[in-house]
C-alpha cells in the first residue's frame, strides 16, 4: 500500500494488513481539526461529535468556547474536560478570553473569540490583562454587520467584505502591542483578508485557516438556510483568492468550523449560523483543491505546527483514503446530530475508508467500532 508521510513529504510503499479490501487505497497520518463546535443540552454532544470526527478521519479536534454556558470559567471548563475524557478522539479546548480563566492547563491550547460578540475597548482591556497564549481569532467588526456580504443576491442587511480584513489587522496589531505573539485567524473568507494576512505574517507569528464551504461555494450558490454561516460566503472572486492562497501557503490550515444544528428554520432571519461538515471535510477539500499531498499537509502537519505539537508517522496510527471514490453527500446519514450541511446532495471525490489509532481499528467504512477492546 502507498503511504504518504506529510512530515517528511515522502511516499512509502509498505504491506499493511487490513480487515477490508485495500486495493487502490492510500494511507496517511490522521487529521487534526482546529475548529469544531459542541452544543450539549440536547444538541451535538461529545459522543456524537466523536463518531462524526472518526468517520471524517479526525483524531484530534479543538472545541470552541461558544457553548451554553460559555467556556469562560473553571467550572464550565472542568465539565467539558470530564465529558470529553477517555475517548478515541482527543478533544482540546480554546477558552474564552473574556472570562475568569487563563488559557492554560489540561488540554487547553489557547484563547478563542469564536462566536463571542465583543467591542474594541473590551478587546484592548482583555489583551492588557490576560496571560499571553495562542490567540484564535474570529475576526469580525460587529459595529457594522449583516447576515451576508455586500453583493450577495439576497434582500437582507449586508456587511462590507472589508469587515473581516479590518478586524484581522485590529486584533493582530493590538495583540502585538500588549505582548501576544501567536495568532491564528479563523475561517478566512475574502481576498482582502488574504492580502492583510500576507502582510501581517511579516510582523508576527500569524497562521490562518479556511473552511471547506468557503473553498467550495460562493454567495451565488446560496439555496437555503444551510448556507447561512458566519462569516458568510464570499464572492466568486473571493473563493478563487482563497484557493490560490491555500496553494501558496498564505492559508496554512484546513479547518471545518463544524457547526451542527439538528434543525434549521427556513427563515434566514431566525435560522442559526452554521454548517455541518466534519464527516465530509476531506472529500470536500480534495474536490475543491485536487491535490492530495496539499490537502493532507494542511489537515495534519500544519495544524499540529499551530498547536506546537511534534508528531511522526507510524504504521499503527493511520487514516485510509480512496482518492478515486465518488459519492453524493446524504446529510441524513451523518453520525453528527447536525444535518444542516450545505454539501447535502453534492457529488464529492475522495473518501475516508477507515481509521486506525494506536493499533486499533476505530472506524471502518463509515461505521464506528463501539468496543475498541475487541481489536486487541
From Swiss-Prot:
It is an enzyme of class 3 (hydrolase). Binds 2 Zn(2+) ions per subunit. GO terms for molecular function: allantoinase activity; dihydroorotase activity; metal ion binding. Pathway: Pyrimidine metabolism; UMP biosynthesis via de novo pathway; (S)-dihydroorotate from bicarbonate: step 3/3. Keywords: Hydrolase, Metal-binding, Pyrimidine biosynthesis, Zinc. SUPFAM superfamilies: Composite domain of metallo-dependent hydrolases, Metallo-dependent hydrolases. Its EC number is 3.5.2.3. The active site is at 257. Zn(2+) 2 binds at residues 114, 138, 187. It comes from the Bacteria. Zn(2+) 1 binds at residues 35, 37, 114, 257. Belongs to the metallo-dependent hydrolases superfamily. DHOase family. Class I DHOase subfamily. This is Putative dihydroorotase. It comes from Thermotoga maritima (strain ATCC 43589 / DSM 3109 / JCM 10099 / NBRC 100826 / MSB8).
Amino acid at each position: 500500500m502507498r503511504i504518504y508521510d506529510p512530515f517528511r513529504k515522502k511516499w512509502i510503499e509498505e504491506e499493511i494488513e487490513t480487515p477490508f479490501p485495500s486495493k487502490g487505497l492510500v494511507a496517511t497520518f490522521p487529521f487534526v481539526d482546529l475548529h469544531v463546535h459542541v452544543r450539549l443540552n440536547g444538541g451535538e454532544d461529545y459522543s456524537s461529535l466523536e463518531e462524526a470526527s472518526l468517520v471524517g478521519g479526525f483524531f484530534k479536534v479543538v472545541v470552541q468556547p461558544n457553548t451554553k454556558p460559555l467556556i469562560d470559567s473553571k467550572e464550565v471548563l472542568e465539565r467539558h474536560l470530564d465529558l470529553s475524557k477517555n475517548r478515541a478522539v482527543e478533544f482540546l479546548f480554546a477558552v474564552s478570553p473574556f472570562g475568569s480563566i487563563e488559557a492554560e492547563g489540561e488540554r487547553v491550547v489557547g484563547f478563542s473569540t469564536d462566536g463571542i460578540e465583543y467591542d474594541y475597548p473590551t478587546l484592548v482591556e482583555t489583551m492588557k490583562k490576560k496571560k499571553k497564549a495562542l490567540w484564535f481569532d474570529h475576526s469580525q467588526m460587529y459595529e457594522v454587520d449583516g447576515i451576508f456580504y455586500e453583493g450577495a443576491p439576497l434582500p437582507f442587511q449586508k456587511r462590507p467584505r472589508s469587515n473581516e480584513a479590518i478586524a484581522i489587522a485590529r486584533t493582530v496589531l493590538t495583540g502585538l502591542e500588549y505582548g501576544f505573539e501567536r495568532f491564528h485567524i479563523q475561517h478566512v473568507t475574502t481576498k482582502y483578508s488574504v492580502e492583510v494576512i500576507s502582510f501581517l505574517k511579516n510582523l508576527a507569528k500569524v497562521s490562518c485557516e479556511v473552511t471547506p464551504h468557503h473553498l467550495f461555494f460562493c454567495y451565488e450558490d446560496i439555496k437555503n438556510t444551510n448556507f447561512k454561516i458566519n462569516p458568510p460566503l464570499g464572492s466568486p472572486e473571493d473563493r478563487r483568492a482563497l484557493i490560490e492562497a491555500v496553494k501558496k501557503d498564505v492559508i496554512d490550515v484546513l479547518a471545518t468550523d463544524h457547526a451542527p444544528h439538528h434543525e434549521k428554520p427556513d427563515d434566514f432571519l431566525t435560522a442559526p449560523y452554521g454548517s455541518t461538515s466534519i464527516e465530509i471535510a476531506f472529500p470536500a477539500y480534495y474536490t475543491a483543491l485536487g491535490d492530495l499531498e496539499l490537502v493532507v499537509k494542511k489537515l495534519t502537519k500544519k495544524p499540529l505546527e499551530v498547536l506546537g505539537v511534534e508528531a511522526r508517522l507510524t504504521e499503527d496510527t493511520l487514516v485510509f483514503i480512496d482518492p478515486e471514490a465518488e459519492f453524493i453527500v446524504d446529510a441524513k446519514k451523518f453520525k453528527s446530530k447536525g444535518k444542516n450541511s450545505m454539501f447535502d446532495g453534492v457529488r464529492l471525490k475522495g473518501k475516508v475508508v477507515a481509521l486506525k489509532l494506536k493499533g486499533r481499528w476505530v472506524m471502518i467504512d463509515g461505521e464506528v467500532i463501539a468496543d475498541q477492546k475487541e481489536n486487541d
